[in-house]
Swiss-Prot record:
GO terms for molecular function: ATP binding; hydroxyethylthiazole kinase activity; magnesium ion binding. It comes from the Bacteria. Pathway: Cofactor biosynthesis; thiamine diphosphate biosynthesis; 4-methyl-5-(2-phosphoethyl)-thiazole from 5-(2-hydroxyethyl)-4-methylthiazole: step 1/1. Its EC number is 2.7.1.50. This is Hydroxyethylthiazole kinase. It is an enzyme of class 2 (transferase). Its cofactor is Mg(2+). It holds the Pfam family HK. GO terms for biological process: thiamine biosynthetic process; thiamine diphosphate biosynthetic process. Catalyzes the phosphorylation of the hydroxyl group of 4-methyl-5-beta-hydroxyethylthiazole (THZ).
Amino acid sequence: MQVDLLSSAQSAHTLHLFHQHSPLVHCMTNDVVQTFTANTLLALGASPAMVIETEEASQFAAIASALLINVDTLTQPRAQAMRAAVEQAKSSQTPWTLDPVAVGALDYRRHFCHELLSFKPAAIRGNASEIMALAGIANGGRGVDTTDAAANAIPAAQTLARETGAIVVVTGVMDYVTDGRRTVGIHGGDPLMAKVVGTGCALSAVVAACCALPGDMLENVASACHWMKQAGERAVARSEGPGSFVPHFLDALWQLTQEVQA
């Protein structure tokens, strides 16, 4: 199984495109991470919007550059709004990304996520346990936490990508991004990133934004992983723990965008 590495030049090129296009991202995400997700997108130059009312969610999905569906704090009313948004996104050809949080541990969200797959997401982002569960290979994970190594989920990710047509992202110590044929690996980051709520959810929002960019979607999505890992490394070098990590992380994302414009 061949895994290619993303080049720094491609990552920088995609970040330049990101800043040029400033995608409007409709984030239907969980209650815990909304502020951090919005700030992450803003730091990179995107425009976030959190619209959750069913009628408005459908309407906004038609005008957004991209849509994110994150099922962490899923409720029946929220599922109804998400379903309406995804239906409209498909009709409007708005690329949408699925973050199937804890899909291997809980039945309701597993059934809901499988239902949404019929609406053809542009991308799916999860940890190893989530991707394996969504692919039907295993039911696992400890809530939102993975119990599997990212590399172990590559075959499941490739299968899921081929079956759905989505770019599939498996995050971990090393991230893997695949379209079912090509697989790209992204190294970097720091274990401290896992001690801050929302880094994975925010990545899903950046992945969604990258699906709206022109060019090679696989490389664009892989670039999103690279930026987050780069910013994480820089933030850890400047912080003393999780509390001071977040502002340094947002600053690091901003600095990355300034560097590609210099």
